[in-house]
Amino acid sequence: MQDASEPVINMPALPMNSVNEQHDRHEDLPEVGTTSVTKIINDSDNEDDENGMDLGRVASESLEGDAVVSIDINTEDSSLSPAKQENEKSPEGIEQKYQEEDLKDDKKSNETIATPVPDAASRASLEKQKSGLTNLEKSTHVVLIKCIEQLIQIKVCMKNEKMKNLMEQLKPLLQTECQFDKFLIVELFQYCFESSQDEVMNISLDTISKLASFAYFSSKDKTPASFGPPKSLLQCMVDMVCDSINDEVVDGNLQLNVVKALSAFILCSEQDSMLHGAILLNSVRKLFNVFLLGDSDTIQSVAQASLTQAVTVVYERLRASHTQSNSTSALPEEDASVTENWVHDEDEPDKKITLHSMASAGTSSLDHVKVDADDPAVTSVENSSIQDAFLVFRSMCRLAVRQTSPDKVSNIRSQAMRAKLISLHLIYRILEKNSDLFMDPTLQFRGIPALKGMTLVHASRQYICLVLSRNAVSPVPQVFEVCCDIFYLMVFSLRAHFKQEIEVFFREVYFPMLDLKNTSYNQKLHTLLIIQRICLNPRALVELYINYDCDRSSTTNVFEQLLFSISKVTTNGPSETISEDIEEILPSLESSERSSTPFLNTNSASLKSEVVQLTTFSDFQLKLKTLQCVLDILQSLSNWAESGLYLSRRGVSTDEQGFVGDYDALSRSDTPVTNPYYNGKQSFEANSHSSSSIALADPSQFESNKQRKKLLRTCINKFNYKPTRGLKMLSENEYVDINDPKAIAEFLFRADGIDKTTLGDYLGEGDEKSISVMHEFIDCLSFINLKFVDALRRLLQCFRLPGEAQKIDRIMLKFSERYMKENPSAFANADTAYILAYSIILLNTDLHSPRIKNKMTKEDFIKNNRGINDGADLDEDYLGFVYDDILKNEIAMKDDQELAAIAPLMNNFSTSSGFTTFTSNGRDLQRVACIQASEEMANKATSVLKKLLYQQKHGSQKTNVYYNATHFEHIGPMLEATWMPILAALSNPLQNSDYVNELNMCLDGFQLVVRIACLFDLDLIRDAFIKTLTNFTNLHSTSEIKLRNTMVIKTLLRIASTEGNNLKDSWKDILTIISQLERVQLIGVGVDETEVPDVINARVRRKNVNIGSSNSIRHVSGSTSRSTRTRSLSKPLSPEAVSELMSTEVVLSIDRIFTQTSSLSGSAIVSFFKALCEVSWDEITSSSDLEQPRLYSLQKLVEISYYNMQRIRVEWSSIWNVLGRFFNMVGSDENRHVAVFALDSLRQLSMHFLEIEELSLFSFQKEFLKPFEYVMASDTVVEVKELVLQCVKQMIQAKISKIKSGWKTLFGVFTFAAKARSEILISMTFDTLVNLFSEHYDTLMQQNCLIDMLISFTELCKNGTNQKISLQSLEIIREVYSSLSTMIKEGLSSKPSVNETFSKYVFPVLFAYYDIIMSAEDLEVRSRALQNLFYIFLEESDDFTEETWEVVSRKFIFPIFSIFGPEADEATVMLRDEEIRTWQSTTLVEALRSLVTLLTRRFDKLHNLLKGYLWLFSNCICRDNITLSRIGTNCMQQLLSGNAYRFEVKDWNLVADMFIELFKETTPHQLLLLETFSNGQGAPVYSENENTQLSHKRGGSLPETSRSISTSSISPEKQMEFRSMIRKCILQLLLISIVAELLDNEEVFNHIPHEHVLKITVAIYDSWQFARKFNEDKSLRITLLNVGFMKQLPNLLRQETASALLYITLLFRLLKTRDPLGKTETDQKIHKLLFPVCAEMLDMYASLVVEKHTRNHAAWQPVIATILDSILNLPLELFSENIHTLYFSCCSMIAKENLDDQLRELLKNYFNRVGHILLNLNAQQE
């Protein structure tokens, strides 16, 4: 029994037209059939009527779980199955059972009264008999007669005269079957109810229920005027039944009969007898009250079942009427006037949305709209049905949101809580069974103007939100659970209409439920259950992502946050061992979808009052449930992706996938793919909106939005850290114009995530820009008609006031200005507002700061604010009101208040986690605090929803578009956004747990993540998850391998088998694990661990080899290695681990991985080979110190090569790029065993490759044979190289006909072998090459192997190890050329071009000879090669064209002398000094001589190359080697003298230019620069006797003191520079001698033009002037001596005299050969160049003092003698013309002491001739 003190919940009789406004779309769900709840008790004449089955007994038996035996209508089975018995324990089960019993009892009743009761359709078709009554009417008369007879037997009825008379009047009428007024029956029942006798009322109610089932009372029949206000008989009877019992405790049978009667009225299917509007609500209200106040649990259960049945019938009628009207009616147009009319705070239109906005909603203006009774649409069946459905739903919502006092909340069995629960359950049932009706856009209100065009979901939207916001955070488990179910329906079926609301509930309710520490176990568990059901829906997950995470207007990334919240539960789980059996936990973790409504009677077992305490066991349950959620998410994503890929492969476009998905189990389409949605309203303008929807339907557009949203978050975070940088970043990314303060202010005002403290500091800054932004920011607020304190509160909610007084001052100044602008009459001026605002801020700090002990009083506050209103005082009452307001309600940020409110849920109250068990003894403070925190969360949720709906009402319709999921491409970005929390959730159990089921869940999750990552090429994610798995294998520490590690290994093997095509670089980790696994298997069978080193640890050691940590370094050999291995054996491998790792499953899995490589794609097999090569190399290097290294992976590498032998050439080319490099390394490995195995494997593979015809094409043979060449070129041991040659020889012998492109590589092997220093290798190579030349020459020529063969023989010639083989190889090259010559001559008939013949046949042989000449180690070989080369040039070059000779000269002849060219590296020349000397003395001499012979013989064709050859000779002449210079001189002279007659003018011009250039390049001009020889400080070094030295005249010697002076240190650079100058001086002398000798040759002098001789003479004159200038600079020469470059005083006397002598000799010779009296320009030029210089030389010689310049005197004497002799030999005319130039110079010679006799004789002759000439002249004159 219920406590009588508890208030009865009376549901008000709401008007029929009371409705709400919302509009949304529908979604099809299966229809639910109608079942009967009430059992109609027949009162036939037999005794069974009185002893019939009672409703209460049936319900009671059903509630207690007893099996109720019923007879099926078809009498096929009289027993109930266990499943059916279980179903009858629920209200739905009772409904079904009652329906069966109703049918059975109706059948009995009809048989008793012999008048069958037809159904509605039959009754409508019956024809009245002529007697005037139908069979149905006769049946009703029987029931009425029975009732009257029972009433007559009751004394109370007979005492009532009116009632007695009425019964006596009615009975005959009923018996005679005459027509009568039905109001008489109503009047009879009225008398019965007025009697207040239970017996009478029970009979009446029983009769009424039967009449109602016969549709006896109609809404068309009206009561007479005398009865009161006119109303229908149907309403009159329903009111009587409802009023028959009150809210006090009454007889249980009477309550049951009332329930039965009301159920009969509600279930009546006749159109005129259906209940609508207020009548229906009145009936439902009475059923609701009976459920609450029922006399027993049985009555409450029956009332609950009847109430459920009534609600179900209302919606079934709506479905039926809509289905019927849909066939004839068209889709109505949406009424644009439909808007939402919640009561909003109009003063805060822009306030941030919080969760408090829903529950604080007031009444809707649509609750009192009037129905237009004249509109025919109002009276239609469909319109009546939709109104009934809405009214019932709204009533349930209103009952569900009623506030409940805390003491009632603690009593779950109280009327208030039971009323809330039944309401919530009915709401859930309505939404679950009829969601398609709610969303059907064709089902709209039509008869009510205010509701016209609305759908059910539109009208009910605010009520659904209100219900959830008020109850979603309830601490009562039952309430929270059903709210979770309702929210799931919102997400599952209605998410397109509740886009923003879903985000709010996730953000404000369900995410905090998982994140906060102290939410109860029940709340966390049911939240996870609902999330799990959402996770099972792939489309819902994808739509959550694209509509929230990819929506730039959404503040919450729902999908991403969902994974983060789930992962927190997983990672925060218990670490201690669970004592309970894990198998007991698993059944409780199933996803519980609500299948039936539980009984909610007072003593129901489903009403438990306690909240389950969180324990280690329950924490573990939550952890498992969280893992299951993660697994379901991954499975859904995988299914969606695979389904989309499957459809795309079938050619189905992405736009069609949403429709095809309806037939695909993997992508179930629970969201209809129709039109886009805006603000929850479907757009009927399909054409206008489809374009924008399609534009954003591209996955790349969603990802662009996602990235843009992420970038905005980054910018805001940057602003929160550094405002100026954040604004700059926002401007750079075009979020805001940094030059527009208004734009910045609006962005800061509306953007989410802005740190309010940072914002306050920025707005308070004193710079001009910040002040402008602050002004615009405050202007965004509206203070119209707001109280001053409220306006200040609104301002300070936008940002946190900075602490600096100047910043506060600036903000308050602007605030006061803004407030007074919008409220000009508030104060006298803005100064008043400014001072008061500042005063209020100080007051708020004073009153609420815990640091201030002496608080400000009201009087102090009033006193402080006197005279601020323009000199006047503000009203004291007003200031007192302000003081009280601040005292009671602190000005604080709402965020701080909300955080403080939910603090009990964030912090642990005690050491135990979660809630403590609520006890009945006293008030639990923890429980109260948590309830208050939950209430605060609910308030926040309702506030958010309120503001959300306000924004939807006043915002743009197209700002909130809901997109359906149609693309599988979203899955990749979804995983990218959430892989980190997924990894955290899945990794934690692998580290700590030993439970198989939990581990299996985690490993399944890993597999799914890798699968998705592989599908979308997410390399980072794939590698991260696979590396995580490899870390959990523990194969690097065999003693620690446990069951979970073996499970991880098996998972990795499964991943390798299933995802091989997409693993890419992750193959390395998997194959490393396989290698480690093979190592563990060997250890398990008894192999010493030291013989199988650990690959992973070895790799770590190599990586950390430079780190000095002893823990990370292990030496490869020595005692350290042995001791380390010994320690690793301290803990042997467990037998269980060995058994698992050596199981058949593992072995077959490994084999399957390798055998399945043949089915991998082209790119995947390359990745596999690459990874296996790396692992194999790790094995080899880790065991390099062992005699038998690990070759497991190398063996597998060869094995899979055989598996994949049938792949096409393109794929093998890619594979061999990897495999070839690997064989290069292993083939040249230091360990002989490794190299031998690799080479033998390579030989076998090569044999197979050669057999494949396709691989012989192009260059693949060359590639797969490359490792042989690489090994031969490496520094490996000779034995390995011998093996290479043997392998190559075997392949040639066995497969020579198959070798095509591989010849190039094979000859490469021979080439590198020919370079070896081993005579064995050289001998093997020579024998093989000779055999190929002699036996297979034609084959090699066909394969174009001439060049390769010549290169091999060339290398043998160059190798000086075996001279005999070198000379034999050289002879073979000669034979090759001979055969080529014969072939060329025989092929002349085809007339190939000379250039083609040369390049194809001759050029390779010439290059071979050239290479031998330049590089051969043996001089004999060089000489013979040179002879052979020039033999070809001299004897076999008749067909060479000038172009051919040009090529030969530039490619072969000139490079022979290039080592001495200016481009040669001096250091190289110095290092090869010995070789050069040998070369110069042998080969080069012979080459130069042969070259002269060649030029002489082939001068006609080489004429154009003369310049190059002259350069070649000059280059040899200019070397510092005297021998080479002389040879060059001789060759030059021989060339010029022997071919002078062939030279043309241009050729002589080249010769002259050559000599001029040589003189110029070899002149050391730097020698004349004094700073060149400075001591490093910019000043030359002089001796202390410098003045004395400088006073000496030309040619004087230095005193001894100067030689004893210490010299400065000379740098190597200075020394090298001076040596270079000395070499140039020597070259000058050599050039002078060359020119002299060359021009002494009469053949040359006669053919060289005189103009070119003059050019050479000018160069010689410059050389003379340079030497003269140096010799005259005494100070420079002394400097050179002091610095230390020379041991004696340097001079250039030889150069000076030699050049002077050559100069005058050439000029006198030119004069001699020309006309003495010639007047040509050349003659005049010779005269000018000769005679003045002669006079100058004579004067210089005359000035020399013999005693001081003895050396100079002697050197110049031949020059002077030559001058005088040549003058004397001049013709008379020329002699006479130049007497005036030379006479005085000769006179000065007479005065010279110790003059040589020769010179004296020459002077004598000169003066004699002069005298004769002068005397003859005088004589002639006389």
Swiss-Prot record:
One of its GO terms (biological process) is endoplasmic reticulum to Golgi vesicle-mediated transport. SMART domains: Sec7. GO terms for cellular component: COPI-coated vesicle membrane; ER to Golgi transport vesicle membrane; Golgi cis cisterna; Golgi trans cisterna. It comes from the Eukaryota. This is ADP-ribosylation factor guanine nucleotide-exchange factor sec72. Residues 85-110 have a biased composition (Basic and acidic residues). Residues 72-84 have a biased composition (Polar residues). The homology upstream of Sec7 (HUS) box is necessary for the allosteric activation of Ssec71.
